[in-house]
Regions:
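Nucleic-acid-interacting cores, centered on viral/eukaryotic replication and modification enzymes
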Residues: 1-184
Length: 184
């Protein structure tokens, strides 16, 4: 469907530009995958390699066409179910799982807010995970063709370094939680 919808393609490109501008991946580190693996093994180091894939959804699809709150939302997500190391084996992670607040916490906050003289607020962090730096084993990514710079046309299998905790990375939630705790 995305291939047949120019608006969906544009939504994905817009999201990719936002993520690149934020420094999520570094296009200046581009190199051939085979060279990355060869150099990494020669140095006795570890790397992880994954694919980023685009998705697109329609927000406000229940609204009439043309409504200002009905729009396409592009997302770029790391395929966390298939991250490989320099030997093409499944990658092993630090298991930095995040601990989202449970239902009990939510109810306690609601209760506090219902007490006379008290109030509560909530908000959603804009592009939350990619506010956090990605740690651990360096992760290199294959960008989808629509997000690759023209200068990459000479590469057979280009990869670049992932710098921020992109959605889909198995440890992204843990890095986001650590980032959030540091700033609270």
């Amino acid at each position: 469907e995305i291939n047949d919808d120019p608006d969906a393609q544009q939504a994905i490109k817009d999201e990719g530009k936002r993520l690149e501008k934020q420094g999520t991946w570094d296009i200046n580190t581009v190199r051939e995958y085979d060279n990355l693996v060869k150099d990494t093994k020669a140095k006795g180091e570890k790397v992880h390699v994954a694919r980023i894939f685009p998705i697109c959804s329609e927000k406000g699809s229940e609204l009439k066409k043309g409504h200002p709150e009905r729009k396409l939302k592009g997302r770029c997500v790391l395929e966390g179910s298939d991250v490989r190391d320099e030997n093409k084996d499944s990658a092993i992670f630090n298991e930095l799982s995040s601990s989202p607040a449970g239902l009990e916490v939510s109810k306690a906050v609601d209760c506090y807010g219902s007490i006379k003289g008290h109030s509560i607020e909530q908000c959603d962090a804009e592009q939350a995970y990619v506010q956090a730096k990605l740690g651990g084993t360096p992760t290199w990514v294959r960008l989808p063709k629509e997000l690759r710079p023209e200068s990459w046309a000479k590469y057979k299998d280009p990869v670049c370094l992932l710098k921020l905790a992109l959605y889909g990375h198995p440890d992204a939630g843990g890095y986001w939680e650590a980032h959030c705790n540091k700033h609270l």
